[in-house]
Amino acid sequence: MQNKRESYTREDLLASSQGELFGPGYPQLPAPNMLMMDRVTKMSETEGDFGKGLILAELDIKPDLWFFDCHFPGDPVMPGCLGLDAMWQLVGFFLGWVGGKGKGRALGVGEVKFTGQILPTAKKVTYEIHMKRVVNRKLVMGLADGRVLVDGKEIYVAKDLKVGLFQDTSAF
């Protein structure tokens, strides 16, 4: 694997969406508009609440982001499912970062709680992912807990985020 670092820029994340960051066969992040972060500020295999990995990432909020125009006209708010997807994206990114190969797919989440919202007046969303387990056998799978914060205030909590890496997704 190439380009294993502790942080990544927007340009790095865009390279990941094209399969160019870690190399052939490694999981890709989605391309814009579904890429839900601007940078990864920290990657660690040993930190986090469970000592199995920590990912910190950020999204700069701008009033002209695509989802504010359609969700909802006259009452713009970032869809909660996009924050959840960002957490899945980061778990998959972590799996590639630790050497896992395959195509990333979200496999589920145990529990999600929304206690706030992301409005166009916000400045920054922070994603915090605490890895609980990584399985690297025939199936590569990550299990994590995550939080979403807007301007420093926790607004979503997700328990047991699951992402798998698959060599063949035709039967998925």
Curated annotation (Swiss-Prot):
Pfam families: FabA
Ribonucleoprotein found in the keyword field: no
Cellular compartment(s): Cytoplasm
One GO CC annotation: cytoplasm
InterPro entries assigned to the protein according to its UniProt record, in alphabetical order: FabA, FabA_FabZ, HotDog_dom_sf
Domain of life: Bacteria
Pathway it works in: Lipid metabolism; fatty acid biosynthesis
GO molecular function, one term: (3R)-hydroxyacyl-[acyl-carrier-protein] dehydratase activity
Record key words, sorted: Cytoplasm, Fatty acid biosynthesis, Fatty acid metabolism, Isomerase, Lipid biosynthesis, Lipid metabolism, Lyase
Active site: 71
Catalyzed chemical reaction(s): a (3R)-hydroxyacyl-[ACP] = a (2E)-enoyl-[ACP] + H2O; (3R)-hydroxydecanoyl-[ACP] = (2E)-decenoyl-[ACP] + H2O; (2E)-decenoyl-[ACP] = (3Z)-decenoyl-[ACP]
GO biological process: unsaturated fatty acid biosynthetic process
EC number: 4.2.1.59, 5.3.3.14
PANTHER family for the chain: 3-HYDROXYACYL-[ACYL-CARRIER-PROTEIN] DEHYDRATASE (PTHR30272), 3-HYDROXYDECANOYL-[ACYL-CARRIER-PROTEIN] DEHYDRATASE (PTHR30272:SF8)
Family that this chain belongs to: Belongs to the thioester dehydratase family. FabA subfamily.
Described purpose of this protein according to its UniProt entry: Necessary for the introduction of cis unsaturation into fatty acids. Catalyzes the dehydration of (3R)-3-hydroxydecanoyl-ACP to E-(2)-decenoyl-ACP and then its isomerization to Z-(3)-decenoyl-ACP. Can catalyze the dehydratase reaction for beta-hydroxyacyl-ACPs with saturated chain lengths up to 16:0, being most active on intermediate chain length.
Assembly, per entry: Homodimer.
Protein's UniProt name: 3-hydroxydecanoyl-[acyl-carrier-protein] dehydratase
